[in-house]
Amino acid sequence: MLRWSRRIGLTLGALAFAAAQASAQAVLSPEQMRDLAGQAVLQGQAGLAYDLTGALIERDETDLDAHLIRSRAARNLGRNDEALTHARRAWALAEGENARYAAALAMAQALSSSGRRTAAQLWLRRAVQIAPDDGLKARAAEDFRYVRRQNPWSTALRFSIAPSSNINNGSRNETSELFGLPFEFALEGEARALSGVEISTGLSTRYRLVNSERKRTDLLFGASHRTYVLSDEAKDIAPDAEGSDFATSSVFIGLQEDYALPGGRSRLGWDARLGHTWYGGEPLLSYTRLGTNYRRATGPNGMLSFSVSREGQSGEGTRDDATIWSAHLGYGMSLASGNTVTVSTSFIQSESDADYLDYTQRAISARYGLAKPIGPAQLEFGLSLSEKIHDRANLTTDGRDERSLQATVTAALPEMDFYGFIPTVTLNAERTHANIDLYETENFGIQLGIRSAF
């Protein structure tokens, strides 16, 4: 915190001047008092700076620099409420980019010292937005990361809009052979792929209960909702369907904990969650999930991760119960060029009396991110392959076998930064081949989203 405080002090605009040569004068001028107060607060003489700025503010209540210095001095003296009062006054007086930037940092510093770190993060985002140059912008972003690490609360908001050729995961075919019969059945309505627009929102938050070098314990909460708007073509195919028929909502609470292992390069953790899911506005299932995870730093730029979990699903209404075991192994690293590469593999086994919930699934995926932008875009490419096998299927005696291929290209647009948030555009193409025509699908879409730049 001391390192960050010193950095904040250095940005409070023209505060570090040479000490006034007051010994030759009986009375210091306001400018000399201001200079001396700025030098005093940087040299750890908060009491002197506090007294000098008090006299300056008594002389001229609109003295911006005096309020900035007094806010810093009051904070160093532990008078956090007073520090916040003078930071607010400085913000009200500030005009121009440099002054507003300095006042925003003073507000963030005072709020953080008062324990209001989430509010401090908002003010640091404001400082990023109004920073006069890239260097000061980067400094405010670094300070944001520091405060975020100290904040027990961490909240992420998600929002995206995604036009899609297949919002309901319907078949790309118009007919399908069923039950082993030597002729095809026409697929109608919701059995076929319906195009439209997906609208997705979500919130996840974490409160850190314990934060030590050895252990971290977090309380978790999350909520999400995804709904759709059908295209005119989809309404012609399925006139009785509405986009909300395919909407999904979910909430969960959880607890997670991880421990630093000897050597300082590995962490071992566990997590538990309780959740509920709705589909089409109706309850679909409740679940309990228990998992464990392991992470290890490999060299200066690599990270290996492994996780295993068990989820017990209790179906609502006519939906059957299921038990789902899953395992995930991944490795990510930064290359010498600054580009990033991530590879992973996963295995899922779902056990249920219902054939559509009883399956095994294997997948491999890779992602590659470019360090240098191409034009205005920071690009990341993704590719995944998966196989899903149902030993039993009510439409055939041969079971059900699906193989899927998905490719994505995501473009982040950092030049359109707004308060530290940047827009993203993701192009998605996915196709599934199956031994049953009904389950052959394809989906082409574009997703517009927002993410934090730091």
Protein language model annotation of sequence segments:
Residues 10-22, 454:
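Hydrophobic alpha-helical targeting segments used for export or membrane insertion
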Residues 1-12:
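Bacterial N-terminal signal peptides that target proteins for export
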Residues 11, 22, 60, 288-290:
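Compositionally biased, intrinsically disordered low-complexity segments
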Residues 17, 22-60:
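N-terminal leader/linker segments that initiate helical-solenoid repeat arrays
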Residues 45-82:
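N-terminal, post-signal-peptide region of Sec/Tat-exported proteins
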Residues 5, 24, 54, 66, ...:
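Low-complexity, intrinsically disordered short peptide segments enriched in small/polar/basic residues
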Residues 29, 38-41, 58, 74-76, ...:
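Gram-negative and organellar
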